[in-house]
Amino acid sequence: MSASGLPFDDFRELLRNLPGPDTAALVAARERDGQLTKPPGALGRLEEIAFWLAAWTGRPPAVNRPLVAIFAGNHGVTRQGVTPFPASVTAQMVENFAAGGAAINQICVAHDLGLKVFDLALDYPTGDITEEPALSERDCAATMAFGMEAIAGGTDLLCIGEMGIGNTTIAAAINLGLYGGTAEEWVGPGTGSEGEVLMRKIAAVEKAVALHRDHLSDPLEVMRRLGGREIAAMAGAILAARMQKVPVIIDGYVATAAAAILKAANPAALDHCLIGHVSSEPGHMRAIEKLGKTPLLALGMRLGEGTGAALAAGIVKAAAACHSGMATFAQAGVSNKE
């Protein structure tokens, strides 16, 4: 419990007092960009990414220690038959990450990214959100605090991902709780739900949001009641990154739901974040639009485990390299426009 009283109090205080961008670093980056050997705007969004890096790190754009952080959790709602896979797959995939056998491992090698995987009490699933809150306030706050430690080893670009059987059900419930609409609008196949399994998934989301309806005006209550440990940990990691001047790339539908909690608590909470990709999960683009973001990639992926964010990190690294490595007109002896 925080020294100030209730477990969430310290997080509410952080969310009220988020640091802003470094305007001097942003101005310096824009000035340098204007001198590089290219027409203004010719690198398109790469230029905006370089400016974003400068603004949120407070220094010239560079990516030297990129990190993919994957948070793994299990969910009591799987007892409702919302997924074709057993919850044991979560732990098995964590072992696969450790052995280097997952897609995210290959992408990290290809783009020279660090990888950390956080096992969040997989033997103790959260409460079934159709019957009770996923977490107590104390447990949710403790998991957020744990997530904040993801960047303790040092990084200058954080990619946020997850693993958790049943967590697209959780993401759909969070989005329905935050934004309204219908369960059908937010529920998708996830790991392959179809037919009766998909119908049970929709019913579970409807039941959960109805059960907790009276508590959904508070985003942190949405998180603890409808979320899960990986949701809380990702929210904590994104928040810690903001406090420590680390830009963030958010992965897919589930990671976007975690980010949405912070955005609902403070409209500026995700200004240091990019959305790495839009997944093929039907509700993801709608969720991204609710955040006022534009994804970097659209590759038809729906794997999770940070893969879309990691691929986007390659683009961010390229943006920084162009900004820092290109010659200026003066250095190259190339004539600038009149």
Swiss-Prot record:
Pathway: Nucleoside biosynthesis; alpha-ribazole biosynthesis; alpha-ribazole from 5,6-dimethylbenzimidazole: step 1/2. GO terms for biological process: cobalamin biosynthetic process. The active site is at residue 305. Its EC number is 2.4.2.21. Keywords: Cobalamin biosynthesis, Glycosyltransferase, Transferase. GO terms for molecular function: nicotinate-nucleotide-dimethylbenzimidazole phosphoribosyltransferase activity. It catalyses: 5,6-dimethylbenzimidazole + nicotinate beta-D-ribonucleotide = alpha-ribazole 5'-phosphate + nicotinate + H(+). Belongs to the CobT family. HAMAP family: CobT (MF_00230). Catalyzes the synthesis of alpha-ribazole-5'-phosphate from nicotinate mononucleotide (NAMN) and 5,6-dimethylbenzimidazole (DMB). NCBIfam families: cobT_DBIPRT, PRK00105.1. PANTHER family: NICOTINATE-NUCLEOTIDE--DIMETHYLBENZIMIDAZOLE PHOSPHORIBOSYLTRANSFERASE (PTHR43463:SF1). This is Nicotinate-nucleotide--dimethylbenzimidazole phosphoribosyltransferase. It comes from Rhizobium meliloti (strain 1021).
